[in-house]
Amino acid sequence: KKQLRNEMKALRAACGDRAARDERVCARFFSLPASEKRSFFIYNAFSNETATAQIAARLLREGKVVCFPRTEGNEMVAVRWQGQATVKGAFGIEEPVGEPFGGEIDVCVLPLLAADGQFYRIGYGGGFYDRFLSGKKIYKVGICYDFQIVGRVPREPHDVRLDALVTDARTMIRR
């Protein structure tokens, strides 16, 4: 897993046309039936991750509930974001200030370093999303650049499968 993570980080860092790719990912995301749902839990992109700002902004304009993650120790909570201040969290990622969201989350947009056609992903290795999603009925969408889709990612029994994968070049929906 470590080698694959490092490989993908290097490929992403070398990617020169991220803005155009991000726009295509955003357009493809909104072609998903799941984009019509009411409440969304979306990662706040940092470094050279696939950007989520356009997706979050459009969902807000459409009157949807948008939550960003905040880490609390070894766990992650959803905090509704309505444009309020953010502060740098434990991993240097901007996290929203405020109370955890008490409602149901319909769709989770997950970050990933690599994913495969069986809808498994590898993230950064902290297990935050696997723990957060465990036992919840939430539609899971992984977004990334197309070069991050590989033949097979290493997997473990606790790994949560995605319901859809959206890249700058294709949309894959698990049947």
Question: Could you say what each language-model-derived stretch is?
Answer:
Residues 1-103:
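N-terminal active-site beta-alpha-beta segment that forms phosphate/nucleotide-binding
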Residues 74-175:
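Conserved phosphate- and dinucleotide-binding cores of soluble alpha/beta proteins
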